[in-house]
């Protein structure tokens, strides 16, 4: 049995200092019935907690660390920037370098604005969509999480789902009434919503792969249908690629599925582990953002040199060949997890998109939030705790997916499959 004495003591202290002892709810590990692990360091595919336990890491800071922990090139870039100055409140050339890479690789982006978080990116994109169209309502999908902006915390997934809360108190009714929600992968409901409210729908915002109800890919024709419906009704299509951006493919989710939105939100990978976000799209739309247009958005640390340098060094190491290797590794892990579950007769459904994998303990195919909620949460919690004992660090929520990095080796994946085999053999009874 692993020892967690130091983590337990640190969490006891933290609960007097921060709400729930953490700075983001899912880190409290409530849904898996254990105290959170306090991490001390990471290198490559491994993390180490303050009690000295080693884990193969599939959280990767919730997705950003696509090259694993403490990537040598990213670390050297950060050292060089820190020695010259961390922020100036003025433009720097590294902003141009990262912006060029983003524009080159993301089909929908002709102009990009850097911000400080994924939430900031989605909030800013919604304001832009409303300002550009002159309309008020937005359409989002049940269980899709787009950050903690008020208008987006309506039937959200991810942390809200993990806590078992339908919505967040504090969201005004006046805000909520302008948010239309329909089931993910249900194109007919989208069409009906446009029949009812089409003249006032500014945009549809969607994760190309719903990553905050587990991992739920789009059904064939769903994204194409959204593109068609929005174009027919004069609304903008926004892809929230904070999670999928540069994660599922070299050209992001939109390249993976061949559907180009009007606006795209990015985060996670483009910051290489530092706080970052971005939104971009057609030049005609983006030129409406201040100072070139009237739609205001600003940020004290937007485009700061540390985040830009980490993001640039992260992206330049990603090539089309990187994603071929991601597919191979992810297929290997997916097949191993499925074989272990089948061997022990455990109800399961596995979804995958690129290097994102979701395992649901249910017999039901998971194509939307209702199906994801059919998972056996008690079994997941027990499975999670046993995987920790086996030295594997997974996201502590049924409604979050696993992430792979370039640092994960075949040996890591084989060890993870072996750990899952042990965990499932213990739990099958």
UniProtKB/Swiss-Prot annotation:
One of its GO terms (molecular function) is transaminase activity. Signal peptide: none annotated. It holds the Pfam family Aminotran_3. It is found in: Cytoplasm. GO terms for cellular component: cytoplasm. PROSITE patterns: AA_TRANSFER_CLASS_3. CDD domains: OAT_like. Pathway: Porphyrin-containing compound metabolism; protoporphyrin-IX biosynthesis; 5-aminolevulinate from L-glutamyl-tRNA(Glu): step 2/2. SUPFAM superfamilies: PLP-dependent transferases. It catalyses: (S)-4-amino-5-oxopentanoate = 5-aminolevulinate. Keywords: Cytoplasm, Isomerase, Porphyrin biosynthesis, Pyridoxal phosphate. Its EC number is 5.4.3.8. HAMAP family: HemL_aminotrans_3 (MF_00375). This is Glutamate-1-semialdehyde 2,1-aminomutase 2. The gene is hemL2.
């Amino acid at each position: 049995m692993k020892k967690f004495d130091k983590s337990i003591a640190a969490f006891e202290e933290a609960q007097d200092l921060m709400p729930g002892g953490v700075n983001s709810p899912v880190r409290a590990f409530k849904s898996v019935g254990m105290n959170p692990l306090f991490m001390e360091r990471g290198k490559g595919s491994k993390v180490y907690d303050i009690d000295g336990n080693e884990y193969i890491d599939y959280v990767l800071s919730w997705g950003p660390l696509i090259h694993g922990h403490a990537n040598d090139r990213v670390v050297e870039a950060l050292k060089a920037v820190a020695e010259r100055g961390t922020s100036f409140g003025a433009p720097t050339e590294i902003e141009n370098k990262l912006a060029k890479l983003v524009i080159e690789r993301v089909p929908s982006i002709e102009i990009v604005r850097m911000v400080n978080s994924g939430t900031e990116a989605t909030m800013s994109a919604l304001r832009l969509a409303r300002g550009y169209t002159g309309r008020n309502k937005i359409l989002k999908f049940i269980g899709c999480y787009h950050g903690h902006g008020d208008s987006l915390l309506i039937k959200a997934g991810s942390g809200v789902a993990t806590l078992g809360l339908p919505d967040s108190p504090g969201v005004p009714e006046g805000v909520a009434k302008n948010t239309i929600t329909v089931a993910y992968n249900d194109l007919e409901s989208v069409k009906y919503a446009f029949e009812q409210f089409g003249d006032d729908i500014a945009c549809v915002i969607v994760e190309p792969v719903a990553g905050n109800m587990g991992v739920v890919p789009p059904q064939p024709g769903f994204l194409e249908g959204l593109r068609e419906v929005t174009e027919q009704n004069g609304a903008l299509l926004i892809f929230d690629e904070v999670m999928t951006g540069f994660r599922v493919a070299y050209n992001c989710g939109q390249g993976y599925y061949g559907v180009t939105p009007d606006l795209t939100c990015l985060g996670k990978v483009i910051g290489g582990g530092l706080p970052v976000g971005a939104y971009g799209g057609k030049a005609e739309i983006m030129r409406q953002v201040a100072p070139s247009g009237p739609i205001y958005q600003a940020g004290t640390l937007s485009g700061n040199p540390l985040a830009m340098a980490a993001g640039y060094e992260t992206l330049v190491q990603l090539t089309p060949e990187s994603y071929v290797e991601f597919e191979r590794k992810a297929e290997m892990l997916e097949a191993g997890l499925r074989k272990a579950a089948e061997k022990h007769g455990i109800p399961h459904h596995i979804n995958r998109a690129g290097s994102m994998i979701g395992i649901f303990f249910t017999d039901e195919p998971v194509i939307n939030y209702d199906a994801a909620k059919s998972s056996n949460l008690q079994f997941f919690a027990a499975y999670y705790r046993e995987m920790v004992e086996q030295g594997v660090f997974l996201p502590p929520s049924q409604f979050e997916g696993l992430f792979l990095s370039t640092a994960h080796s075949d040996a890591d994946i084989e060890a993870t499959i072996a750990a899952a085999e042990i965990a499932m053999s213990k739990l099958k009874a």
